[in-house]
Amino acid sequence: AHIITDECISCGACAAECPVEAIHEGTGKYEVDADTCIDCGACEAVCPTGAVKAE
C-alpha cells in the first residue's frame, strides 16, 4: 500500500487519479485505505509535493 506523509497539501490530485478510490480526505492530509489500494503508483506519480510514498 501507499502512505501519505505530512508534506501533503490536500490538493486532491492523488484522490482524483486513484483508479480504485482508495484515497480520501483525512484530518490535515489525505489518507490511503490500505485494504483497497492496489499499489499501482498513480497517486505517487501525480503528487506535486512528493508526499505519497510506497509503504
From Swiss-Prot:
* Limits of the 4Fe-4S ferredoxin-type domain: 2-27, 28-55
**Keyword Electron transport annotated:** yes
Q: Where does [4Fe-4S] cluster 2 bind?
A: 18, 37, 40, 43
Annotated residues that bind [4Fe-4S] cluster 1 are located at: 8, 11, 14, 47
Which GO terms of the cellular component aspect does the record hold?
cytoplasm
What does the Swiss-Prot or TrEMBL cofactor note state? Binds 2 [4Fe-4S] clusters.
GO terms assigned for molecular function: 4 iron, 4 sulfur cluster binding; electron transfer activity; metal ion binding
Q: Does the keyword Iron apply?
A: yes
A Pfam family matched by this chain, by name?
Fer4_9
Q: Which UniProt keywords apply?
A: 4Fe-4S, Electron transport, Iron, Iron-sulfur, Metal-binding, Repeat, Transport
Q: Which cofactor does it need?
A: [4Fe-4S] cluster
Q: What does this protein do?
A: Ferredoxins are iron-sulfur proteins that transfer electrons in a wide variety of metabolic reactions.
PANTHER family membership:
PHOTOSYSTEM I IRON-SULFUR CENTER, PHOTOSYSTEM I IRON-SULFUR CENTER-RELATED
Protein's name according to its UniProt entry: Ferredoxin
From what organism does this protein derive? Thermoanaerobacterium thermosaccharolyticum
